[in-house]
Amino acid sequence: YTAAFSETPDPNPNYAHLSYEDIKAITASGHVEIQNHSYDMHSQSPRFGSKRRQGENSQSYKAFFCGDCIKLQQLLKDKCGITPTAYTYPFGAITPDTTEYLKELGFKASLGCEEKCNYITRDPECLFLLGRYNRPSGISTWEFMKKALKGSAK
């Protein structure tokens, strides 16, 4: 895919994307998994990622959050034949109740944005709110891994 994108300019080089055909092809390889990162919670305003808005009641929030998750789950199933099992919070914006909502929807794991090492045990609960290291553009793999390894020494 790198060659294809190198030869054909991405319509938005600041935020590359994959088509459903791309997703089908890379998941068929067996080397890549696609997970849920929300259908439409990638703004910072009026809602910050998937976080509950101030003054929003829990019933409305649950309906909104779960509806968004289900929409992407269904699209990926219908168009790509896959069902994500993990959810990654946009911006790492987490509302405490969402872990329970995700479990109700059948998710097996979730990732926040806290840069930390994860200690995986046989307890399935340890798979929720996993830490992750976001790699920004403009930094080498060496620099990125050095930072991540430094974080693991804490």
Regions found by a protein language model. Name each.
Residues 1-31, 42, 78, 82:
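Active-site beta->alpha N-cap acidic-glycine motif
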Residues 29, 33, 39, 43-154:
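C-terminal active-site subregion of NodB/CE4 polysaccharide deacetylases
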